[in-house]
Swiss-Prot record:
Protein name, as recorded: N-(5'-phosphoribosyl)anthranilate isomerase
Domain of life assignment: Bacteria
Pathway(s) the chain acts in: Amino-acid biosynthesis; L-tryptophan biosynthesis; L-tryptophan from chorismate: step 3/5
Organism, scientific name: Petrotoga mobilis (strain DSM 10674 / SJ95)
Entries under Pfam families matching the protein: PRAI
Protein backbone atom coordinates (compact mmCIF):
# COMPACT_ATOMS: atom_id res chain seq x y z
CA UNK A 1 0.00 0.00 0.00
CA UNK A 2 1.28 3.45 -0.95
CA UNK A 3 1.54 5.83 1.99
CA UNK A 4 0.54 9.45 1.44
CA UNK A 5 2.14 12.56 2.91
CA UNK A 6 0.85 16.09 2.38
CA UNK A 7 3.50 18.74 2.95
CA UNK A 8 3.28 22.46 3.63
CA UNK A 9 0.54 22.41 6.27
CA UNK A 10 0.06 25.85 7.86
CA UNK A 11 -3.36 25.86 9.52
CA UNK A 12 -5.69 23.77 11.67
CA UNK A 13 -8.53 23.60 9.12
CA UNK A 14 -6.34 22.02 6.45
CA UNK A 15 -4.69 19.68 8.93
CA UNK A 16 -8.01 18.32 10.19
CA UNK A 17 -9.66 18.00 6.77
CA UNK A 18 -6.63 16.32 5.21
CA UNK A 19 -6.30 13.92 8.13
CA UNK A 20 -9.93 12.92 7.70
CA UNK A 21 -9.33 12.32 3.98
CA UNK A 22 -7.07 9.40 4.82
CA UNK A 23 -3.47 10.55 4.55
CA UNK A 24 -0.69 8.95 6.57
CA UNK A 25 1.50 11.96 7.34
CA UNK A 26 1.51 15.75 7.41
CA UNK A 27 4.61 17.82 6.72
CA UNK A 28 5.30 21.09 8.54
CA UNK A 29 7.97 23.31 6.98
CA UNK A 30 10.03 24.97 9.71
CA UNK A 31 12.55 26.47 7.26
CA UNK A 32 12.21 29.66 5.21
CA UNK A 33 9.44 29.05 2.67
CA UNK A 34 6.11 30.51 1.52
CA UNK A 35 4.69 27.61 3.56
CA UNK A 36 6.78 28.16 6.67
CA UNK A 37 5.04 27.57 9.99
CA UNK A 38 6.34 28.32 13.48
CA UNK A 39 6.87 25.47 15.92
CA UNK A 40 4.36 27.07 18.31
CA UNK A 41 1.70 26.88 15.58
CA UNK A 42 2.51 23.22 14.92
CA UNK A 43 2.01 22.52 18.63
CA UNK A 44 -1.42 24.14 18.40
CA UNK A 45 -2.36 22.21 15.26
CA UNK A 46 -1.06 18.92 16.62
CA UNK A 47 -3.46 18.99 19.57
CA UNK A 48 -6.36 18.70 17.11
CA UNK A 49 -4.98 15.80 15.08
CA UNK A 50 -5.76 12.10 15.44
CA UNK A 51 -2.85 10.11 16.91
CA UNK A 52 -2.42 7.82 13.90
CA UNK A 53 -1.34 10.64 11.54
CA UNK A 54 2.45 11.06 11.53
CA UNK A 55 3.97 14.53 11.87
CA UNK A 56 7.05 15.44 9.86
CA UNK A 57 9.30 18.43 10.62
CA UNK A 58 10.86 19.73 7.40
CA UNK A 59 14.17 21.52 7.96
CA UNK A 60 16.94 22.93 5.78
CA UNK A 61 20.53 22.92 7.04
CA UNK A 62 19.51 23.15 10.71
CA UNK A 63 21.97 23.68 13.54
CA UNK A 64 22.15 21.19 16.39
CA UNK A 65 20.02 23.38 18.65
CA UNK A 66 17.15 23.43 16.15
CA UNK A 67 17.02 19.65 16.03
CA UNK A 68 17.15 19.43 19.82
CA UNK A 69 14.21 21.85 20.04
CA UNK A 70 12.22 19.70 17.61
CA UNK A 71 13.03 16.60 19.64
CA UNK A 72 12.02 18.25 22.92
CA UNK A 73 8.68 19.38 21.49
CA UNK A 74 7.44 15.76 21.44
CA UNK A 75 5.29 16.69 18.42
CA UNK A 76 7.08 15.04 15.53
CA UNK A 77 7.62 11.47 14.41
CA UNK A 78 10.12 12.28 11.66
CA UNK A 79 12.60 14.98 10.68
CA UNK A 80 12.93 15.58 6.94
CA UNK A 81 16.31 17.08 6.03
CA UNK A 82 15.85 19.06 2.83
CA UNK A 83 19.20 20.82 2.49
CA UNK A 84 22.86 19.84 2.26
CA UNK A 85 23.24 18.77 5.87
CA UNK A 86 26.36 17.29 7.42
CA UNK A 87 25.84 13.56 7.87
CA UNK A 88 26.51 13.77 11.61
CA UNK A 89 23.55 16.02 12.34
CA UNK A 90 21.30 13.44 10.66
CA UNK A 91 22.98 10.49 12.36
CA UNK A 92 22.55 12.11 15.78
CA UNK A 93 18.86 12.92 15.31
CA UNK A 94 16.77 10.98 17.84
CA UNK A 95 13.69 10.88 15.62
CA UNK A 96 13.22 8.89 12.43
CA UNK A 97 14.92 10.59 9.52
CA UNK A 98 14.00 11.38 5.92
CA UNK A 99 16.72 12.70 3.60
CA UNK A 100 15.61 14.66 0.56
CA UNK A 101 17.67 14.22 -2.60
CA UNK A 102 16.97 16.78 -5.32
CA UNK A 103 17.06 15.23 -8.78
CA UNK A 104 18.25 17.14 -11.83
CA UNK A 105 19.98 14.39 -13.81
CA UNK A 106 21.69 11.03 -13.31
CA UNK A 107 24.59 12.62 -11.45
CA UNK A 108 22.16 13.63 -8.70
CA UNK A 109 22.00 9.96 -7.70
CA UNK A 110 25.56 10.16 -6.37
CA UNK A 111 24.19 11.83 -3.23
CA UNK A 112 22.36 8.67 -2.20
CA UNK A 113 25.48 6.79 -1.15
CA UNK A 114 26.28 9.36 1.55
CA UNK A 115 23.11 8.50 3.46
CA UNK A 116 22.18 4.95 2.41
CA UNK A 117 23.44 3.31 5.59
CA UNK A 118 21.69 5.37 8.26
CA UNK A 119 18.62 7.32 7.14
CA UNK A 120 15.19 5.74 7.56
CA UNK A 121 13.72 7.04 4.29
CA UNK A 122 14.77 8.92 1.19
CA UNK A 123 12.61 11.55 -0.48
CA UNK A 124 13.27 12.37 -4.12
CA UNK A 125 12.25 15.86 -5.23
CA UNK A 126 12.80 18.03 -8.29
CA UNK A 127 15.85 20.29 -8.40
CA UNK A 128 15.04 23.74 -9.77
CA UNK A 129 17.92 26.11 -9.11
CA UNK A 130 18.26 26.74 -5.38
CA UNK A 131 14.58 26.29 -4.58
CA UNK A 132 13.80 24.17 -1.53
CA UNK A 133 10.91 21.97 -2.69
CA UNK A 134 7.42 23.10 -3.66
CA UNK A 135 8.52 23.73 -7.24
CA UNK A 136 5.41 22.26 -8.85
CA UNK A 137 7.63 20.47 -11.39
CA UNK A 138 8.27 16.78 -11.89
CA UNK A 139 11.63 15.24 -12.76
CA UNK A 140 12.43 12.33 -15.06
CA UNK A 141 11.27 9.40 -12.92
CA UNK A 142 13.15 6.92 -15.12
CA UNK A 143 16.38 8.19 -13.54
CA UNK A 144 15.49 6.51 -10.25
CA UNK A 145 15.40 3.09 -11.89
CA UNK A 146 19.20 3.27 -12.03
CA UNK A 147 19.59 4.24 -8.38
CA UNK A 148 21.05 2.03 -5.65
CA UNK A 149 18.45 2.77 -2.98
CA UNK A 150 18.72 0.65 0.16
CA UNK A 151 15.90 2.32 2.07
CA UNK A 152 12.18 2.93 1.49
CA UNK A 153 11.62 6.08 -0.51
CA UNK A 154 9.08 8.84 -1.00
CA UNK A 155 8.40 10.45 -4.37
CA UNK A 156 7.82 14.21 -4.45
CA UNK A 157 7.89 16.94 -7.07
CA UNK A 158 4.84 18.24 -8.92
CA UNK A 159 2.55 15.32 -8.12
CA UNK A 160 -1.11 15.89 -8.98
CA UNK A 161 -4.30 13.94 -9.75
CA UNK A 162 -3.27 13.98 -13.41
CA UNK A 163 0.13 12.33 -13.04
CA UNK A 164 0.01 10.38 -9.77
CA UNK A 165 -0.96 7.04 -11.33
CA UNK A 166 1.79 7.19 -13.95
CA UNK A 167 4.34 8.19 -11.30
CA UNK A 168 3.50 5.28 -9.02
CA UNK A 169 3.40 2.73 -11.82
CA UNK A 170 6.72 3.97 -13.19
CA UNK A 171 8.89 3.70 -10.08
CA UNK A 172 6.70 2.13 -7.39
CA UNK A 173 7.64 4.34 -4.45
CA UNK A 174 6.81 3.42 -0.87
CA UNK A 175 5.08 6.77 -0.40
CA UNK A 176 4.21 9.96 -2.24
CA UNK A 177 4.45 13.56 -1.08
CA UNK A 178 1.83 16.06 -2.25
CA UNK A 179 2.30 19.80 -1.98
CA UNK A 180 2.07 22.63 -4.50
CA UNK A 181 -0.13 20.87 -7.07
CA UNK A 182 -2.90 20.35 -4.49
CA UNK A 183 -3.06 23.96 -3.27
CA UNK A 184 -5.29 26.95 -3.80
CA UNK A 185 -2.22 29.09 -3.07
CA UNK A 186 1.01 28.50 -1.09
CA UNK A 187 0.05 27.32 2.39
CA UNK A 188 -3.65 26.73 1.66
CA UNK A 189 -4.55 23.26 0.45
CA UNK A 190 -7.32 22.28 -1.94
CA UNK A 191 -9.08 19.42 -0.18
CA UNK A 192 -10.97 18.51 -3.36
CA UNK A 193 -7.73 17.92 -5.26
CA UNK A 194 -6.26 15.99 -2.35
CA UNK A 195 -9.26 13.69 -2.17
CA UNK A 196 -9.17 13.20 -5.94
CA UNK A 197 -5.48 12.28 -5.77
CA UNK A 198 -6.09 9.85 -2.91
CA UNK A 199 -8.92 8.20 -4.84
CA UNK A 200 -6.65 7.72 -7.85
CA UNK A 201 -3.91 6.24 -5.68
CA UNK A 202 -6.35 3.82 -4.09
CA UNK A 203 -7.57 2.73 -7.53
CA UNK A 204 -4.13 1.62 -8.70
CA UNK A 205 -3.60 -2.07 -9.29
CA UNK A 206 0.10 -2.85 -9.62
CA UNK A 207 0.92 -6.26 -11.03
Amino acid sequence: MIRIKVCGITNIEDAINISKAGVDALGFILAESPRKVELSKVLEISKELPPFVSRVAVVVNPVKEEIEKIERSKVFDYVQFHGSEDVNIIKNCKLKTIKAIKIENKSSLEEISKYNDFVDYFLFDTKIGEKIGGTGHTFNWEILKEANIKKPFILAGGLSPENIVEAIKTIRPNAVDLNSKVELYPGKKDIRLIKETIDRINSIKIK
